[in-house]
């Protein structure tokens, strides 16, 4: 057997070759140290080059956001479980600002504010990211809000219309139906989504901030039942999450929506609700020892909401003509809309829908107070048909409310006032809707027009909603041409109006009220002419009795 021998020259040559080809990989890394931590906030020393809003890496893969940049230390908000963060642990810079993955893969999913799925349906494949803090579109990049976004709620679409690119505040006390109004708006986009027309389709994002987990699950179940989850993304920061997640959740939803908007698509974002985001930001600011202001909120709480809501826009045609519509929700206490956060958001948005607890308790649902609800876009965001029939609706309801209050103290009213009260009561009944049951705009136009023409005046109040439902089903066949005209974007002309009235009167003849009576108006007697006054004749018909 041959003996294996290696000469020292060969060993020396191999070592020389290795050292000649070796190039050490040196990397420079800034490392800081946690000086103290509590309640989701960590103070870190030793990161002199850290940027504002930069992501920091804590042990265990937990990340934080640098908010306070002081001379000797950084105040960071920990995103995630902060129970294991301890004093003395190392913290590293990432060099990245806070961003979230975006794309169509997020439709139908439930995610946390960092874009991670929490619905148990697997990972979300995404190739693009978008920073959470991005500048809103400039004035020259926008165009006026003129395209309607139908909510399916008669009281809103008729009197406080919402346009694509608008910011409409939904405000009211707790348990007055604020979330239900926004969910109805999402459900009403189903027909547009099924049409397959990109110009009609609206992608929806529901951002739940500080809500109970069961509430978020209920919203998801309602959307799934109606087939709306296929075009909806839910960003969830439930009450059990840290203040950092509640603070960031609206920006995550907005970033995902902006991605679609700049692709020329239309987006609806619901922020439920911004009161809890402001409270979370207040907690963060106080823990970071920032000076408190009114109601202990920090001085930049207005900027917190303004930079979020200013991202809503209808982009110019040069940028694709996409839109981002925002429905922020604010919770009031005892109907006080003059508190700090409500007045801030009212001044930022393009109108508000005020839901009143007294109306809700009376059974008026949605409990919209049309007196102080307003849309600054107005008729520009309505179809021609709706704009024509809804012009006097707000005035009639306002006069009804005023007369109703007066009649409580009046013992006797004239016939005209009684008729106005009767019609107003039927208008209020007509504007009621069941939860999660949006109504197509063509049905809304027909109902409001017929109410204005007095068709419902002879219908008992308890039968108004049943009469409306059965009438609309009948008119879709007996007045199909009128519906086609309305769907084509046209206003009701004289011929269509006459056809609608004729078909309605025919249906009315066969309608039986719940008490068994008919609702057909009796024929009105013609007034006497001037030459007939004081010359009236009475004709007496005698009955012959057979014996």
UniProtKB/Swiss-Prot annotation:
One Pfam family this sequence matches: ATP-synt_ab_N
Binding locations of ATP: 172-179
Keywords tagged on the record: ATP synthesis, ATP-binding, Cell membrane, CF(1), Hydrogen ion transport, Ion transport, Membrane, Nucleotide-binding, Translocase, Transport
SUPFAM superfamilies: C-terminal domain of alpha and beta subunits of F1 ATP synthase (SSF47917), N-terminal domain of alpha and beta subunits of F1 ATP synthase (SSF50615), P-loop containing nucleoside triphosphate hydrolases (SSF52540)
PANTHER family the UniProt entry points to: ATP SYNTHASE SUBUNIT ALPHA, MITOCHONDRIAL (PTHR48082:SF2)
Topology of this chain in the membrane: Peripheral membrane protein
A single Gene Ontology CC term: proton-transporting ATP synthase complex
The protein's name: ATP synthase subunit alpha
Subcellular location: Cell membrane
CDD domains, sorted: ATP-synt_F1_alpha_C (cd18113), ATP-synt_F1_alpha_N (cd18116), F1-ATPase_alpha_CD (cd01132)
A Gene Ontology molecular function term of the record: proton-transporting ATP synthase activity, rotational mechanism
Highest taxon above the source species: Bacteria
Family: Belongs to the ATPase alpha/beta chains family.
